[in-house]
């Protein structure tokens, strides 16, 4: 196991902290490891079932770090040490899309990029959606909300229109959860 010898913070703002750790590897050699500390976040799959089929709501926004506009599920975090994950998910959903959910289902907690960052992301399914007024942050003033069919969404994944790893992972998790839920429902019907 890698052991931490020392740690020092090299940068901080209200969203991110960066530290450099001096480490000792299992073979006894020392080195450094850069770690990005971020507070927990949420990602929300806003799913709407209608007579015409199933639809998801997506966000299109400019992502500064990669220099372009990208499409993804609503996601983000709050700059607070302790906050309820579902409360944060409901807040992010309302803030970015204007949507309010009658039902929120917790699916899992994922590590976003544990090779460099310790941030966790709580994954929620939002159903029973009602449209309200979006309240984006200053950094999100260019958000565009899109409602697309599940088939169109999955096509966007395969065509690399959506490349956000968190959205791809959340959708894969949802698909597995949904299949397991269907299987459990079918098993209960057989009894």
Predicted regions and their residues:
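Short beta-strand micro-motifs in enzyme catalytic cores
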Residues: 17-21, 31, 55, 69, ...
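Acidic, metal-coordinating catalytic segment for phosphate/diphosphate chemistry
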Residues: 6-45, 51
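Short, well-ordered beta-strand micro-motif
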Residues: 20-22, 46-48, 125-127, 147-149
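Nudix hydrolase/Nudix homology domain
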Residues: 2, 6, 69, 117, ...
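A short coil-to-beta-strand element that immediately follows conserved catalytic motifs
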Residues: 3-4, 100-107
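Acidic pyrophosphate-coordinating catalytic loop
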Residues: 9-13, 64, 110-122
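Active-site-adjacent beta-strand/loop module that shapes the phosphate/pyrophosphate-binding cleft
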Residues: 22-27, 113-133
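Conserved Nudix-box catalytic region and its N-terminal flanking loop in Nudix hydrolases
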Residues: 33-39, 45, 52-91, 139
């Amino acid at each position: 196991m890698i052991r931490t010898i020392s740690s020092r913070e090299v940068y901080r703002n209200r969203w991110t902290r960066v530290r450099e750790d001096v480490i000792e590897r299992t073979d006894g050699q020392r080195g450094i490891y850069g770690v990005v500390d971020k507070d927990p976040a949420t990602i929300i799959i806003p799913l709407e079932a209608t007579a015409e089929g199933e639809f998801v709501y997506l966000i299109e926004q400019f992502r500064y770090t990669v220099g372009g506009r990208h499409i993804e599920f609503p996601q983000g975090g709050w700059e607070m040490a302790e906050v309820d994950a579902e409360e944060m998910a409901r807040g992010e959903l309302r803030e970015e899309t204007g949507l309010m959910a009658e039902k929120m289902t917790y699916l899992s907690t994922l590590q976003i990029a544990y090779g460099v960052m310790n941030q966790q992301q709580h994954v929620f399914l939002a159903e029973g959606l009602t449209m309200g007024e979006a309240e984006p942050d200053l950094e999100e003033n260019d958000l565009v909300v899109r409602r697309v069919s599940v088939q169109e969404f999955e096509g966007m994944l395969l065509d690399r229109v959506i490349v956000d790893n968190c959205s791809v992972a959340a959708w894969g998790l949802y698909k597995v959860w949904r299949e397991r839920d269907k299987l459990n429902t079918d098993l209960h019907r057989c009894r």
